[in-house]
Amino acid sequence: MGSFILALDQGTTSSRAILFDRGGHVAAMAQQTFPQHYPQPGWVEHDPLEIWESQRSVAAQALEELGPDARIAGIGITNQRETTILWDKATGEPVYNAIVWQCRRTAGICDKLKETPGMAETIAEKTGLVIDAYFSGTKLKWLLDNVPGARERAERGELLFGTVETWLIWRLTGGAAHVTDYSNASRTMLFNIHTLAWDEELCRLLAIPMCLLPRPVSNSEIYGTVVPGIEGLEALAGIPVCGAAGDQQSALFGQGCHERGQAKNTYGTGCFTLMNVGGRAVRSRAGLVTSVAWSLGGKTIYALEGSVFNAGSAIQWLRDELGLIGTSHECDLLAESVPDAGGVYLVPAFTGLGAPYWDMYARGCIVGVTRGTTRAHIARAVLEAIAFEVTDLMNAMRQDAGCEITVLRVDGGASVSDVMLRFQSDLLRIPVDRPQMVETTAFGAAALAGLAVGFWQSTDEVRALRVSDRVFSPERAQAECDEKYRLWKRAVSCACGWIEKA
């Protein structure tokens, strides 16, 4: 057996490849950004071929870094979820750009679905989701309805649909495996999370030909092997692709949240809080959604999830659009230079509000600005906004789960911010635990792949590899934090419903 597991981590703004050894340590890593396309306000697209090429390139770089003696036992994939790709079965050519999870172009389709009596209840009951442009189903419908000839070609069986892990597995296996794992399938709004199968009624309602859909599979099994002849990946020929999970479920697994009641938050482009709710799907009454966390060894685990669309992207906005900071780290330095945000509240609803508000028509706002407001106050307001968003999610989760969450495990790029995590602990009134090895999303995919081929023998062995770096505990007075949170809710009310429905 090989000495390493290769994890392919395909994210919203970059593709990464990480090689893990048996101790869960990073042995080699490569990362590459790829272009974002914004054809209209509120629309977000990726070129699927750029996704593939960037992922292929970083895998080749990571293998080269490790050297010619690297022996790979298996490949795990984790990915940005909901992003929707439609391609030609024969040529592998995409028929259109990938419609990214952040894209709001299908808000009108969602509005019509909501107007149908009983539709919201049916979708919630079967899929665990709310009707929102976030999920893949309406994105796929848009492609079929708007790309010339796509619907006819789909009905003739000439096209294939997939989320990003499906696309990557299909490319790696030379088209031999057209599959999706249960965690990604559960984010499409087409998948019944109770039967673990595509739902014929929902596909019919959205006019989705079922011949397009990939075969649903568990999160830890051999899907196929890498074909020879992929440039830079010749050494992977014959290596099994054997683990896959959506990025947030993968992070939950990688954080060792394997027991009911354990929760994590990923501070990435968006913010994603997930709680393991065990082997029974819990229906949310507080604006959250229910998804498959993973299916392993014949046992399916579910998660409550709250997703916000813009978190780390707000820091990128300060840097790239406003030019207030030169690097992401500078946001932290500026925020630490002031004791608070000076009464400024920023709601980063650039592409609407996710859980628990689900307002497709919200847009970003900054309130409380005075002549004394500095860029340091704005920087701190951004970091505090991210913590407020997570607090919204955690409050909803506590309400739905009916049990107390005693610690929040955290990861993601923005989790390096001590300022933000201190404030997060203050707001939640519980410890916030950051691990030493922050690549928990990639490690989750590696662990699922490793378990499939016996690289690791048990989830207990995987869980023991997690080590804390720092645990943040509440410091500010609760009354002060409660008042700040009250004002945050006022600021959110200013952002809601800003765009008028067409």
PLM region descriptions:
Residues 64-101, 130-136, 169-192, 217, ...:
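Short beta-strand-loop/turn "lid" adjacent to the catalytic site in phosphate-handling enzymes
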Residues 5-8, 69, 107, 114-178, ...:
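Active-site core segments that coordinate phosphate-bearing ligands/cofactors
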Residues 32-33, 101, 288:
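A generic structural motif
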Residues 211:
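A conserved beta-strand/loop element that lines the FAD pocket in flavoprotein oxidoreductases
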